[in-house]
Every structure is written in structure tokens, then in C-alpha cells.
Amino acid sequence: MSLKAEEITSIIKSKIANFTPQADINETGTVLQVGDGIARIYGLKNAVAGELLEFPNNVKGLALNLETDNIGCVLMGEDSSIQEGDPVKRTGQVINVPVGDALLGRVVDPLGKPLDGKGPIKTNSSRPLEIVAPGVIERQPVKQPLQTGLKAIDSLVPIGKGQRELIIGDRQTGKTAIAIDAILNQKNQPADQRTLCVYVAIGQKQSTVAQVVQTLTEFGAMEYTVIVSASAADPASLLYIAPYAGSSIAEEFMWNKRDVLIIYDDLSKHAQAYRQMSLLLRRPPGREAYPGDVFYLHSRLLERACKLSDKNGGGSITALPIIETQANDMSAYIPTNVISITDGQIYLESGLFHSGMKPAVNVGLSVSRVGGSAQKKIMRSVSGTLRLDMSQYKELEAFSQFGSDLDKESQQQLTRGKRINELFKQDQYTPMPVEEQVLVFFAGTNGFLDNIEVNLVKEYEKQLLTYFKAEKKDLFEELKNAPEMSENLTNKLKEALTAFGEVFKNSHSTAQ
């Protein structure tokens, strides 16, 4: 078959007309130096701060230092496979994390990859790691309570939805235990109104995270919880982005009109990871060798917790950051920074913890700066004088150790203080509904415990709740639904507590 010259010409012309160039244009750079999870890259002149870079073997990096002739980049994976001279590509993207309901009940790393062996996470939604926190107009004041189920906190250091409340104390004083109890207590709410929880483990041992997962699963709390884990074995870069990833996951729920509780456990290790990265990137060190912007590191994170205005859906993020102190020193750099950013702190003391006071909340140094306006009126009516009573009791207790003779009124204060102090004690994983707390504190502050031996207070509390649920159902229900303590309700409670006092006295006199 012979082709004519015109046909050949027309074929060539059509091929030229339909030709589309397939060249893949990539801006690439070269690795100059790599080590300790840091790479220096030559080239990539148009890279922006915070951009995701792609290395060989599917390792990702985050551009942090943009210098005149090179880029300082932290690696999001193992650096042993990267060599000097390797090509590096720009992605033109910032880090995004998968978000949405598909993450509930899952354990993920800060990049959203599953760690629980339950298969891939099926979600099409993602959010950038870092966003600007909502502005003043987009927010509303904190006015709804968030119950933790812990008597010492809900009565004296109340937390509101949208608040940032710091949990601070030495190692092994029960900081994580408070956070886990707060998560467990959200199970008491109806499923459609339940506060969702995000637990961010930063630099924790993997065995500790496994223990948290097991506890939450046992109590049925994993179904409304997401765990973001950057363990002690992970690179500092993953520890650095973990809290921001947790915050992005929480924000998706918040903008969908949900309430979220997020726990950062703990921000001391987060600051240490950032210090490590900054020193390796040759940024100038400041106080305690932390970089100059370590305050901004935490302030931009914690400002993302808020209560949105009704116009924006009214969702909220309540943050409970945890800080570990050394030898009860709250005046160190990171603790003072985070105290000044948050809306109050729950201070746990090792001395109290070892003396058997659990949770070991130091009532004098713990404060909630905005939660008071969110506390339920009925709780405020019984706990209003508690803080003053407890501080007077502590003062008297110290004074009475000198063996001084005390007048009758002071002895009365000591007697009541000892018993109320006993009421603050609570076992782990036993969060208490607010109506039970109100009943117990009402009994304590109105003198119904004054004639009970201190070692029997716990037994009294247990039997009191059982008695009310069985014998005084209607009154207990009325207490549960009452917005505030009316005179009628007060009289009914006093009557019922007097009757129970006789029952308790008789049961113990016969037992003896």
C-alpha cells in the first residue's frame, strides 16, 4: 500500500495539532546534609515556610528554616535511607490531617495513619495542621458547664465549655488520671449531646498509651474518643505536630456544632521536642535553651480552643493541657508560660498524693478564671463557701499542731473540715454525676457528717447515695432536675438526711 505525499502531510499536521506536552515540571533541590532528623537542602528557591517536601523512599519533610542559600527541614520519618545528593521535590502543600466521624474509636499518628490495626480510615475530609484561631466576633463567652465527674474539680475549680484549664504537677501525681476520668464522665450524657473527646499523647511510652486505650475500651468510652499518639520512639518532628493534628481533628467536630474535650498529655515534652528541633536547626537559644518563640508555640495552639457563637453553630473545644513540673516548681519557664495562656490551673501536689489524698488537688493554688460563670447554680449554692472553709481548715490544722487549746468554734471548724476533706477523695475511674455531688456536699456543709467518724465518711457517702436511689427516688429526681436550691428542696433534703443519719447510726451500732 502506497501513501500519497498529501496524506502523509495531513497525518503529520493532525499529530502536531493534537500534541500535548507530557513533561512533568517539578521544582527539585538537593540534600546537602542530613542527620538527627534534620536535612539541609540546596535549591527550592520558591519553597514556603511550613511546606511539605518529598524525599526518596516516600519520606516527607517540613520546611522550617528558609535561609539565603539553603532550607532547614525536619524529617517526618527515618533519616537513615536519605543520603547527601538525594533529590528533594516541592509538593506545594502544607500538612493536612484526615478528620471526621471515621476517626472516632481509632488510634492514629499525627499524620492520620492508623496505629490500631483496624484497617485504613475511610474519610474524604481533611484539614490543615495549622489554622488561625477563631476571632473575637466568632466566639461567645464560656457559660455552659463541662462536668469532669470529680468532686474536687466540679465544686471548686469548675470548667466551662470552651475553656482552657491547665493540669499541672510533678510526675506520678495523677495528672493523666484526671484527664481520663473527665473522658469517662462524658458517657453519662445522651449519645446525641455527648461531648466528643480527643486525647493527644505526646512523647508517652507506647505501653502507657496502650493502657489508656484499654481503659477507655473497657468503660465503653472509645466510641466517642480519638487518640492521637506520637510516642517516645517517634522523631521530634512528629511530637511537634501531634497537638496541632489533635486540634485540627477537634475543630472539624466543633464547626459541625459539636462539643469537644481535648487533652494534651503533655506539653512539657512538646516544648522539649521543639527545643531539640530548634537547636539542631541552629536557631538561637534563649532561657533554659528554649527558642525565643516557645511561648507562641503554645499560645497559638491553645487559642484554638473556644466556644463558637450561635451564628457559627455554637460548637466548642475545651482544652486540658498537662504540664509536668520538677520538684513542684511552678515558676519554671514552660509552666509559667502555659499558666499565663490558660484560663486557670488544677495544681496537683506530690505531698498530698502520698498522704492518700486522691485526686491530689491543692485547693489553695488551683483556680478557674472563667468557669465560675459556667457552674450550675445548684452546685454553686452548696460549694460557694467550700474554698473559704477549706483554707480556714488548713490554717487551723497547722495551728492546732502546736498543741494550743482551741475554742469551741475552732474545734467545730476542724471537725467539719476533716470530714469535707475526706469527701474530696475519690477512686480512679469512678466519676460522679453532678446531682450526687450536690447531695454529698449538701450533707457535708450542713453538718450532717459532724458526728460521723472520719474513717466512716466514705462508707456514709456510699450508703447515702444507695439510700436516696432506693428510698427517696422522687426527691433524688427532683434534686437532679432542680436548676437551683430552693427553700422547699433544702427542707426536704435536711429531713431526708436526718432520717438517713438515724439509719446509718443504727446500722453501725448493731454492727459493733
Swiss-Prot record:
The keyword ATP-binding applies. It is an enzyme of class 7 (translocase). One of its GO terms (cellular component) is proton-transporting ATP synthase complex. It is a peripheral membrane protein. It catalyses: ATP + H2O + 4 H(+)(in) = ADP + phosphate + 5 H(+)(out). The record marks 366 as: Required for activity. ATP binds at residues 169-176. It comes from the Bacteria. Its EC number is 7.1.2.2. GO terms for molecular function: ADP binding; ATP binding; proton-transporting ATP synthase activity, rotational mechanism. Keywords: ATP synthesis, ATP-binding, Cell membrane, CF(1), Hydrogen ion transport, Ion transport, Membrane, Nucleotide-binding, Translocase, Transport. PROSITE patterns: ATPASE_ALPHA_BETA (PS00152). It is found in: Cell membrane. Produces ATP from ADP in the presence of a proton gradient across the membrane. The alpha chain is a regulatory subunit. Belongs to the ATPase alpha/beta chains family. F-type ATPases have 2 components, CF(1) - the catalytic core - and CF(0) - the membrane proton channel. CF(1) has five subunits: alpha(3), beta(3), gamma(1), delta(1), epsilon(1). CF(0) has three main subunits: a(1), b(2) and c(9-12). The alpha and beta chains form an alternating ring which encloses part of the gamma chain. CF(1) is attached to CF(0) by a central stalk formed by the gamma and epsilon chains, while a peripheral stalk is formed by the delta and b chains. This is ATP synthase subunit alpha. It comes from Elusimicrobium minutum (strain Pei191).
